[in-house]
């Protein structure tokens, strides 16, 4: 829970990474208690094939609530979202969930880029620019979340 409070966006990405790890290597669930507990939750929530833990969904909901508050309160934040929206809309249209929120799309973008880098696949300069924007938005949200 310390990671969640310190950087909620990293917390969500960390949970997604663990979910994928446990799907790929279920036998590793016994490596430590945290993995064992998360594996049990994944089985209980019936997401061993796909989907996200309720822990991750709840954290994303918290981030979404903060995002919506900031959209109403901060013109600079609203401007950053407007600027990245066209790129996020393209990303959303290429997923199986085109109605996902902008914040979830930012997280998906960063997660997909991480996977591409692990595979040593090239990242276009346009994608790197959008990554930079998404990172700044998520950093700001995480910082604001931590200060609450």
Where do the language-model regions lie?
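N-terminal interaction modules that seed assembly of large macromolecular complexes
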Residues: 1-51
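Intrinsically disordered or highly flexible coil/loop and linker segments, enriched in small
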Residues: 24-28, 44-48, 69-72, 93-97, ...
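Glycine-rich, aromatic-bearing surface loops/beta-hairpins
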Residues: 90-148
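Charged, amphipathic alpha-helical oligomerization/scaffolding segments
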Residues: 17, 37, 41, 55-62, ...
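Charged linear interaction tracts used for macromolecular binding and regulation
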Residues: 68-101, 109
């Amino acid at each position: 829970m310390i990671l969640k409070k310190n950087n909620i966006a990293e917390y969500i990405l960390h949970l997604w990474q663990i979910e994928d790890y446990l799907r790929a290597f279920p036998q590793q669930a016994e490596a430590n208690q945290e993995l064992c507990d998360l594996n049990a939750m994944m089985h209980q929530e019936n997401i061993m094939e796909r989907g996200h833990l309720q822990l991750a969904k709840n954290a994303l909901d918290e981030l979404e609530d903060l995002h919506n508050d900031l959209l109403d309160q901060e013109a600079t934040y609203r401007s950053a979202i407007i600027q990245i929206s066209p790129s996020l809309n393209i990303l959303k249209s290429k997923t199986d969930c085109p109605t996902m929120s902008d914040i979830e799309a930012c997280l998906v973008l960063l997660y997909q880029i991480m996977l591409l880098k692990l595979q040593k696949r090239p990242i276009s300069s346009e994608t790197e620019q959008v990554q930079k924007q998404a990172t700044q938005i998520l950093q700001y949200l995480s910082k604001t979340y931590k200060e609450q």
